[in-house]
Amino acid sequence: ETDITSCDDGRIYEKTETLSEEGRTLKMSGKINGISKWPDGYSVVVAGFNDESEYAVVTKTIPAVEDDEIQVTMTGVSDKVTTIELCVINKLRKRVISFQSMDDLTAVDDTILMDVGTVNVGMYHGIQEKVFNTTCAHCHGGSSSAAANLYLTEGKSYEALVNRPSKKVDGMLLVKPGSAQESVLHTLLNTTISSTWGYDHSKEIVSSPILTLIDDWINNGAQE
């Protein structure tokens, strides 16, 4: 074996230098409500992402505190991080829903500040904001009428879906709490059952994490 130590410069380097945490520190403050409504497998976090991936580079779990101002400190925000988000990730650290995002990462004394204000990060609220509002409501209640008289707009969708009998599939509920497999919403999004109803809804949501999110919401009791 070659003795590679013979040609070093003789100085002893402190090992701690190579172990010091890389990058900046984020301090996030705000009132963040609804964390406890998420089931196992999901985490409400502040996270750093780069442009290339939906997987978080660095994360810090946010404690479940209702109606109280909290501050969360996340260290190790490297230069690879281009956005910081208040979001929900799955077990693989993949972004499922983002509630707030910040790409101005100006640091003062190596500290980035993020004030999120008051945010509802509840599971159903996330589905409403990021799925129903963006994908479903333009046909279901966004205008003066709603397709199939089904309103999926904010404040109306929960009543319209949960424990409501389907008008299209006899004997089934639109959402049966505790059983996605027996819910028309699940079947509608994951199969072509609705292709004979005038519109194939399975084209609407192709993101696997979002389909899983809706199933997990139903299977965990379909709470509001």
Residue ranges and their predicted role:
Residues 1-72, 77-224:
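Aromatic- and Gly/Pro-enriched helix-to-coil junctions and flexible linker segments
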